[in-house]
Structures are given as C-alpha cells and as structure tokens.
Amino acid sequence: VLAYDVRKFLDKRGVYNPGLPNPVLGLTSRDFCQYACGVYAANGIHAHILPAEASRFVPTPELSYTIRELRAHGGLNMTASHNPPDDNGSKFYTELGAQPVAPEDQLMSELVDRVSTIRHLSWADAVRSGRVHFLDDACHRGYIEMCRKESLIPPPKLDEIRVVFTPLHGVGYFCAGEVLEAQGFHPIPVPEQMTPDGSFPNVTKTPNPEVPECLDLAEGVAREKHAHLVIATDPDADRYGGLANTKTDGTGDYRYLNGNELAALLTHFKL
C-alpha cells in the first residue's frame, strides 16, 4: 500500500547547489509514490495506490487501517509529516499497520545501505504489468465507519459541542474531519487552512499542532464562534493538538493542550 501527502520538494532552505541539475526539485509526494510503484512492480511486488486523478488523500492513520484491511505485507507513506517540505521522505509500516521498532528498524536500514542496483519500471509500464492496483472508496468508508463505532458517547445535539477543526493545509479532513461529521458533529472550519497545500501559506511557524503558534488562526475562529474545542492535525494527520475553552459556554479563554495532556484526558475519560 502506498499513500502520499501534499508536499512538493522545493529546496526552500537552499541546501542544494542551484548550478547543478537536480531531477528531484519540483516533484510531489505523488510522484515519489508512483516511482516506488515502479520499483515494487519491477521486483514482482503488488502495490495499491490512489488513482492519480483522485481528489482525496490517504492520511497515515487510514494507511494503517488499509494495510490490515487488504492483508498487505506493509505500507509506505511519502510525506514530510510535520516537517518542512524539503524533508519529504517515507514512513514504512508493517503488516500490523505499525511502524517498525528496534531492532527491526535498524535491520531495515542496514538492508537499504547494502542495495547497489535498483530494478525499476516506468509508471506506465508498472501499471501495464498488472501489479499496480488502484484503491476505491471501500477502504476509506470502512475506516470512517470503524472510527465512528469506536466513539464512547452518542452523537451530540446540534450546537451542544462546538468544535473548530483545521488540517493545517494537510490531509486531516479526510480522516478526523470526516469522522467528526459522521458522528454528528458540525466542525467549524478554518477557511484559510482547509485546502491541501504543501507550502502551508497560512500556517504560522510550522505545520505542527504541538506548536501553539500554529493554532493562532484556529483560535481566532474559535473566539468568534464561542467554540468549546479546537482540534488540529498535522499534514499527514497522525499528530493532534488542540485548545479547550475554560468555560462550558465557550466564552472563556483557551488553554493549549499538548500531546501528553490529551492522552491523559482521553485515558481518564475512557477509564
């Protein structure tokens, strides 16, 4: 299984010599995924990927679900996660939908270092080989429904809980946003940050929801709408951050919640 986020390799930090030819510049995560499909197909491995014309993306949590749903041997997500676009790379997931841990991760790294030649097919030849399979909406619908069923509370009454949501120009709407809607919430969008855009034009500092400054726009919307919560996801949607209003009617101040605090609150609620 292969997925991709919205990044394009632009060398924003200027670390490459502009006088040298560089075929990487300008490539998107989708291009890298198609190249990976060519490597897999050339080596007799079947790969599943969204069609190039798809209007949605596969967030990292959904990738983990899709691996198990398709009984795949693993998954690969081309993403820079919450880092600058120049850090576009890959996240590998095992057949369990989890990232490898020690010592497996080190063994994989050593295997990569020993590779001296690469068998590769062009994208067109990889598709013609029959080893590239295009994902339909079935897995996506299954993922949203699975998440919805995990909810411990009934759907809220209209306006009972007002939630502002931002994917920070990433792909989080396709998981967190849709799950909120499926469960009966009416998430209030941050209009400037809803469109997937790997240059993050409307994000302060960094697209990392664990950095409070990147929630400035969302907090502004929350104050205007007297929202109870702000929920933000990082570009590939496997990292969350948020704000909570200090008053139940949404008229208080907003308190930033880091990952440890969110985990503690959710664990306490579930127990």
Predicted regions span which residues?
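N-terminal small/polar loop signature for handling phosphorylated ligands or for N-terminal nucleophile
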Residues: 3-87, 179-242
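Amphipathic alpha-helical transducer elements in NTP-driven molecular machines
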Residues: 60, 105, 260-264
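Short glycine-rich phosphate-binding loop at a beta-alpha junction
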Residues: 1-6, 162-165
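Short, conserved glycine- and acidic-residue-centered signature motifs
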Residues: 25, 29, 104, 260
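Active-site catalytic microenvironments for nucleophilic, acid-base chemistry
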Residues: 69, 114, 182, 269-270
